[in-house]
Amino acid sequence: MKTYTVAVLGATGAVGQEMIKVLQERNFPVGKLVPLASARSAGKTVKFRGEDVTIQEAADTAFKGVDIVLGAAENDIAKRFAPAIVASGAVFVDNSSAFRLNPEVPLIVPEVNPEDVKNHKGIISNPNCSTIITVTAVNALNTIAPIRTMTASTYQAVSGAGAGGPIELMNEVEALREGKTYEPKVFSHQIAFNLIPQIGGEQFEGYTSEEMKMQNEGRKIMHLPELKVSCTCVRVPVVRSHSISVSCHFDVPVTVEQAREVIATAPGCKLVDDLKNKQYPMPLDTSDQDIVFVGRIRPDLTDDNGLCLWCCGDQVRKGAATNAIQIAELLVKE
């Protein structure tokens, strides 16, 4: 079997560590792993297939001989190293938002638009976590009738803000239990026993950057250039897995039975929809999973051509690391 030299840019972060874990779990044909990080992490090691692999400092020369680079770093790092990665002949599968809306860069959810991989010119973008979870859930509906508009509310776990998110939540809970105060450092407000209805800065007409990603990225992934999405993104005191409430609107009626049938067999989805027996997607059940759970499918009472649903997915795995590895799997099948 042919093997590949795979670099992970940002190997010490939460997503980078998960990428290394998923590479092992999915038996990706890695001949050599090259973990890359900042100078302060160089010389440390990561575990891969039972062995210690030394972390190297990210530099332009580090990509020589690499076949695939999995990006788990911030926008500035992705932009800094993208030219060197492409020049080296490697393919850059980037989890940052740096290139997502670039018309020359495919934006891929393998269950939705795998055919777009062939259009890459050295860079492929991984979509935003909540976008991945949502389009994986609703794409099956789009095969019944094109989705015209969507209204979504996201309930995003604290780990979506990085490794410091869960630590801050736990510290606040402990401080409150002891009657002490705790000054938030990761979030703009206390997150324990609270909701924060802002993720990202204001971008357009009162919508945040996180909220606009759902429309802009959803259009590109599902090949629906006229799709309109109104989204509200909320940070919630859940450690892991994002949840999304979605209303989809079509030009023709789509029944609940039709929706359940296509979602039950849709790639990357698991139908969990039995309200009578209290069975529906929940963050606790989807954490550390690679599929999106979908349920609470019902008519939209405000629109005869609308359907509502609820979906949950692990934003570190399917929303980031696993989706990137799935893209790499498409590349090696080419």
Residue ranges and their predicted role:
Residues 1-191, 227-228, 278, 292-293, ...:
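N-terminal Rossmann-like NAD(P) cofactor-binding subdomain of oxidoreductases
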